[in-house]
């Protein structure tokens, strides 16, 4: 029997690092890059295998087959470029002022290692600012015996003035900015530590121990009455011997704070709020957010804007892409110029055009414009501003008006369809897919696109219960259930729809 052959193990410690460096060199040289990352107006080329291995965001996009990935424009392009370089090198240089931007970009790309590191950087930067200011060193009195400490606590609790429950709680007094932001501070919590600077020099060497205690204990003590009992441990009140609690209670009685908002906060809370900016500067008193009323109704006390003219007005005299200040245009916020010389508008009687009653036309949106009724005769003065491409005025007894697109010469009998079609030519795509970040000019296009991600068959046939992903497919299917048929007069072939018959008749040779 032959002896067992020797097995040699080859292990290169820096092989993975050198491989990434080689890939990074290929990326910088533009070799073998198979994916493009776009951020705002900038773009960069990279290898899809590296991006998918380092970022779940890129992996999800690449699994959908995208060769061009758009990063949401919430962070600067340079920050995303740094994170892509981090995937190749494993090193990242973060300045103190840029930590929040890098954290935001890493959260979008879902790079967990960078998220953890930036979170620690921000936490270390805010740790000195959130703690209470260091008091001046004072002589520390000798610790009291447990019996003396209990006697002192009973004396302080009995001498606490009525109407100020919880004023002797030193742990709550250290958290005015964290606990009192939504509402004005109470006398006990706001004036406790900063009532008298000369009395706040008591030693407070616990550091962050009180800050690290859970808020559940504080909430529980608030519900029970706010004061400590006899069974609590002595270390909870290390400042009793220095008279800190009595001074805090007296200062709370002498100077009750006025509910002046952010001006009552002091120490670290004031520094934190001053650095973040006053809330009054950001949101004035008259500000009411649009999401307070889900139904879109204006809340009481909110100033309302003057309603704009509800009629469909298309202006073609302005240059393309120019938006004028003031209230938004009723139909769509863009202006298209005709490719050729503008057609002269038909003559119209002088004077302002009569506006329809407000109850007939609601406030219009780009996708919800009212359609022209076939039996309705518009006012003669509204004809010059109805369409920029020389739409003919309608006279009684004539054919329904047609709206012709000045770009592709496509005609429409409905003003609603014409408006939606003109919005496509504007180049604006305000509707964006939340999965692949593709943008669409109309909401209908976005809804049709979302079926590719969800696969939901929301349209069902009422006759045979067959389901379809698109409404157009359902409409085509419903033709098979119609009892009437359109026969061909030449060959006798039967069709379910007249459009199919007309197409078939066009194929017949002329007699």
From Swiss-Prot:
GO terms for cellular component: nucleoplasm. InterPro entries: BTB/POZ_dom, SKP1/BTB/POZ_sf, Znf_C2H2_sf, Znf_C2H2_type, ZnFinger_BTB_dom_contain. A zinc finger (C2H2-type) spans 403-425, 431-453, 459-481, 486-508. One of its GO terms (biological process) is regulation of immune system process. GO terms for molecular function: DNA-binding transcription repressor activity, RNA polymerase II-specific; RNA polymerase II cis-regulatory region sequence-specific DNA binding; sequence-specific double-stranded DNA binding; zinc ion binding. Gene3D superfamilies: Classic Zinc Finger, Potassium Channel Kv1.1, Chain A. Residues 159-168, 378-397 have a biased composition (Low complexity). PROSITE patterns: BTB, ZINC_FINGER_C2H2_1, ZINC_FINGER_C2H2_2. Residues 159-241, 294-403 are annotated as: Disordered. May be involved in transcriptional regulation. In the central nervous system, may play a role in glial cell differentiation. This is Zinc finger and BTB domain-containing protein 45. The gene is ZBTB45.
């Amino acid at each position: 029997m032959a002896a067992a052959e020797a097995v040699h193990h080859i292990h290169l410690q820096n092989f993975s690092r050198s491989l990434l460096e080689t890939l990074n060199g290929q990326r910088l040289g533009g070799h073998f890059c198979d994916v493009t990352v776009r951020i705002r107006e900038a773009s960069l080329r990279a290898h899809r295998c590296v991006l998918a291995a380092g970022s779940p965001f890129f992996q999800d996009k690449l699994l959908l087959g995208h060769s061009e990935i758009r990063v949401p424009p919430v962070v600067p392009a340079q920050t995303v470029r740094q994170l892509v370089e981090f995937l190749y090198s494993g090193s990242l240089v973060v300045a103190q002022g840029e930590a929040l931007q890098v954290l935001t970009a890493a959260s979008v790309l879902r790079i967990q290692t960078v998220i953890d590191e930036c979170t620690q950087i921000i936490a270390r930067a805010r740790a000195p600012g959130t703690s209470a200011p260091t008091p001046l060193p004072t002589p520390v009195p000798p610790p009291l015996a447990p019996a003396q400490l209990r006697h002192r606590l009973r004396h302080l609790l009995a001498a606490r003035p009525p109407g100020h429950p919880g004023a002797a709680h030193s742990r709550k007094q250290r958290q005015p900015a964290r606990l009192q932001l939504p509402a004005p501070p109470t006398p006990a919590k706001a004036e406790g530590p900063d009532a008298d600077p000369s009395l706040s020099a008591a030693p407070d060497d616990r550091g962050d121990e009180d800050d690290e205690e859970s808020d559940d204990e504080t909430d529980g003590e608030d519900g029970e009455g706010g004061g400590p009992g006899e069974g609590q441990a002595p270390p909870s009140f290390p400042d009793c011997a220095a008279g800190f609690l009595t001074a805090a209670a007296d200062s709370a009685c002498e100077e009750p704070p006025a509910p002046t908002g952010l001006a009552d906060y002091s120490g670290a809370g004031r520094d934190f709020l001053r650095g973040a900016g006053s809330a009054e500067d950001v949101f004035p008193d008259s500000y009411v957010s649009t999401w307070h009323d889900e139904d879109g109704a204006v809340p009481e006390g909110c100033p309302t804007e003057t309603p704009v003219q509800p009629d469909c007005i298309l202006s073609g005299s302005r240059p393309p892409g120019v938006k004028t200040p003031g209230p938004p245009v009723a139909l769509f916020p863009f202006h298209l110029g005709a490719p050729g010389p503008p057609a002269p508008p038909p003559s119209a009687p002088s004077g302002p055009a009569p506006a329809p009653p407000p109850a007939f036309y609601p406030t219009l949106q780009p996708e919800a414009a009212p359609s022209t009724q076939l039996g309705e005769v518009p006012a003669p003065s509204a004809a010059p501003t109805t369409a920029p491409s020389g739409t003919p005025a309608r006279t009684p007894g004539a054919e329904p008006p047609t709206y012709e697109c000045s770009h592709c010469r496509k005609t429409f009998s409905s003003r609603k369809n014409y408006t939606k079609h003109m919005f496509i030519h504007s180049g604006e795509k305000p509707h964006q897919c939340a999965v692949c970040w593709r943008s669409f000019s109309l909401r209908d296009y976005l809804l049709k696109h979302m079926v590719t991600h969800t696969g939901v068959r929301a349209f069902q046939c009422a006759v045979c219960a067959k389901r379809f992903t698109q409404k157009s497919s359902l409409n085509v299917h419903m033709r098979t259930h119609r009892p009437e048929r359109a026969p061909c007069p030449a060959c006798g072939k039967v069709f379910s729809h007249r459009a199919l018959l007309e197409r078939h008749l066009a194929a017949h040779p002329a007699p």
